[in-house]
């Protein structure tokens, strides 16, 4: 084999390796929105927007995180940034999520714990579901809609 051919073979091999999927890359991204009722006195609405980044760790099981942004219907606590770590179990077209993480508020108690679970249906690239969680001094109940990117 001539020296020039070896060079092209090596270059082709490096190109194929560069384009191969890497284990460190997220395998699924979901862009979503939600609306919740928060029972903290006197009760308020929360509208959230987030991007799930998920990695498959076993068949039907994914781990990931969900950064985002939220707005509330209260002037006392107007907005913030949620950062949930999550586990998702997929069974056919049904998914179940468990999550925990800090929510950072722009006013008042800056960091609050968020723990909960959700479930829903995967209809092609569309995800429809619900969620129940605990956020600091009250429960949240709401719906979710998402789109797999």
Label each PLM-derived region with a short phrase.
Residues 1-28:
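Cleavable N-terminal export/targeting peptides
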Residues 6-7, 37, 54, 102:
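Residues in intrinsically disordered, low-complexity segments of regulatory proteins
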Residues 9-10, 40, 57, 105:
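Intrinsic disorder/low-complexity segments enriched in polar/charged and small flexible residues
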Residues 19-73, 87, 142, 146-148:
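Short glycine/proline- and aromatic-enriched beta-strand/turn motifs that initiate or cap beta-hairpins
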Residues 49-132:
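Gram-negative (and chloroplast) outer-membrane scaffold detector with strong preference
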Residues 121-126, 143-149:
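A signal for specific C-terminal beta-sheet/loop modules enriched in small/flexible residues
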Residues 139:
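N-terminal glycine-rich cofactor-binding segment
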């Amino acid at each position: 084999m001539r020296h020039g051919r070896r060079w092209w073979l090596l270059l082709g091999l490096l190109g194929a390796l560069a384009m191969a999927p890497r284990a460190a890359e997220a395998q699924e991204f979901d862009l979503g929105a939600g609306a919740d009722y928060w029972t903290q006195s006197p009760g308020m609405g929360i509208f959230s927007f987030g991007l799930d980044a998920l990695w498959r760790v076993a068949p039907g099981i994914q781990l990931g995180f969900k950064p985002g942004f939220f707005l509330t219907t209260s002037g006392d606590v107007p907005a913030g940034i949620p950062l949930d770590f999550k586990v998702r179990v997929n069974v056919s077209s049904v998914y179940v999520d468990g999550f925990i993480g800090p929510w950072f508020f722009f006013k008042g108690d800056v960091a609050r714990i968020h723990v909960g679970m959700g479930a829903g249906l995967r209809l092609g690239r569309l995800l429809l579901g619900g969620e129940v969680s605990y956020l600091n001094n009250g429960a949240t109940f709401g719906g979710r809609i998402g789109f797999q990117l």
